[in-house]
Design a protein with these regions (language model features):
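Short amphipathic alpha-helical segments
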Residues: 4-5, 71, 232, 236, ...
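A sequence-level detector for short glycine-anchored, His/Arg-bearing signature motifs
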Residues: 286-313
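N-terminal leader or domain-start segments enriched in small/polar residues
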Residues: 95-98, 102, 107-111, 115-293, ...
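Intrinsically disordered, low-complexity Ser/Thr/Pro/Gly-rich regulatory segments
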Residues: 1-173
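Solvent-exposed functional surfaces
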Residues: 37, 312-416
Length: 416
């Protein structure tokens, strides 16, 4: 069990492009009068991730965390001193640690990976680490297996690492960049969306979308009940990738996305255009910030991530990633719209798109119902059942995660 747990976590970091420091795992040392060890260290550029594994049963995790709290606090209180200590203590580690960066530019994160669920109060008592609970472990294993190095942006987001602080080849870029695309803006009278919604269409290269995109997947790590998108499928990604290599052409159907609030449709003078004053479609410039996790994909995640980067990058795909352009329809929300209203809008749109292809599965409809009609009988039943499965008498009996086997499906029970 322990070996399998470590293997799954290691594969996620390796697939994302992190390098494992090989000669320090499980070796005892004393730092600041505290005897301890580190289970694993992974590095990407100036980001250093210290990983602590445990396969203790739920009842024993609290004690394990309590024993680790002191060393976690000491490391996070002075990460520069700790990294200097490691370089002096373990010969050969200097070459594996981030080179070319000032010590103050190095970012240290401690990740605590428990194989079993445990009480949330222990996390509150030991707030230092990033907690990669087992569902998150399996989630990143699946995502990184499907999209390899292109999973790195989401993993860094999970680690609460600001991407602007992450270096490249020993350098950290201070200025912010953006990509400008030619597109068209639909008048509000022609879209029939509510007032203030802007609909723009433009062509964007897959590389830019891969750097900027995120997907709110139902089985992901984000702490929200209002998630409904399916897990990414490696088989589907590989199928589209094979098509791209064989046909050398893009899919012509739209990628549907939400754009960050600072995006504005601009005219030739780079002035913001008011779509409410338009009587016909207008040519515009769309300036997208080159910022990870800023463009939300509502429909088309497999078509975008089929261009993903790998360790030994496929030369054909690498070329198509920058040469080809995907047709993108972007939605810019009104400034005053709340997060709840945005989630409802996206859920309704997602259901409309997917229910026209085939009959949407009851599981999908129920997940979207939680967003659109939270007080409907099915939504209440689904939430109650989920809570009972998480920490009640139905724990281990009802399916909670995409990787659960030999369990009853929530959608079947709720429908019944």
């Amino acid at each position: 069990l322990q070996a399998d747990h470590r293997s799954v976590v290691r594969s996620s970091f390796r697939n994302a492009g992190f390098a494992r420091v090989s000669n320090i795992s499980d070796r005892q040392f004393t730092f600041d009068n505290q005897a301890t060890d580190i289970d694993d260290i992974f590095i990407f550029e100036n980001v250093i991730v210290l990983i602590e594994y445990t396969c203790a049963q739920s009842s024993g995790v609290g004690e394990h965390l309590k024993n680790k709290k002191h060393i976690f606090d000491k490391i996070l209180a002075d990460p520069v001193q700790f990294l200097t200590f490691l370089e002096n203590r373990f010969s050969g580690i200097t070459e594996q640690l981030a080179t070319g960066y000032h010590p103050q530019q190095k970012i240290v994160r401690i990740v605590y990976c428990s194989r079993h669920d445990f009480d949330e109060k222990y996390k509150a008592n030991v707030p230092g680490p990033v907690y990669m609970d087992y569902p998150a472990v399996r989630y990143f294993a699946a995502v990184s297996d499907a999209v390899r190095r292109s999973s790195r942006h989401e993993l860094l987001h999970f680690l609460n690492v600001d991407n602007t602080a992450v270096g490249s080849a020993g350098k950290i870029t201070v200025s912010t960049s953006s990509n400008e695309y030619s597109g068209s803006l639909l008048p509000e009278a022609h879209s029939h969306f509510d007032n203030g919604f802007k609909i723009v269409t433009f062509y964007a290269d897959p590389e830019a979308l891969l750097r900027s995109a995120y997907v709110l997947r139902k089985d992901g790590w984000r702490d929200s009940l209002n998630l409904y998108q399916r897990m990414i499928s490696r088989a589907k990604v590989e199928g589209i990738r094979a098509y791209l290599k064989k046909q050398k052409r893009v899919f012509i159907n739209n990628i549907i996305v939400t754009l960050p609030p600072d995006v504005r449709p601009l005219n030739s003078k780079h002035e913001t255009i008011d779509s409410s004053t338009l009587t016909q479609t207008a040519a515009v410039k769309i300036k997208l910030p080159d910022r990870p996790n800023s463009i939300g994909i509502i429909d088309g995640q497999h078509r975008v991530f089929a261009y993903h980067e790998t360790a030994d990058d496929d030369s054909e795909i690498a070329l198509l990633r920058v040469q080809q352009n995907l047709l993108v329809t972007g939605i810019i929300y009104p400034q005053h719209l709340s997060n709840i209203e945005r989630e409802k809008f996206e859920a309704r749109l997602f259901l409309e798109i997917n229910s026209t292809q085939t009959n949407a599965k009851s599981q999908l409809k129920q997940a979207i119902g939680l967003v659109l009609e939270p007080f409907a009988s099915e939504s209440i039943a689904a939430r109650v059942l989920s809570q009972l499965a998480r920490s009640g008498p139905l724990q281990g009996v009802v399916e909670q995660h995409f990787f659960d086997t030999n369990t009853l499906k929530t959608s079947s029970i709720v429908s019944f």
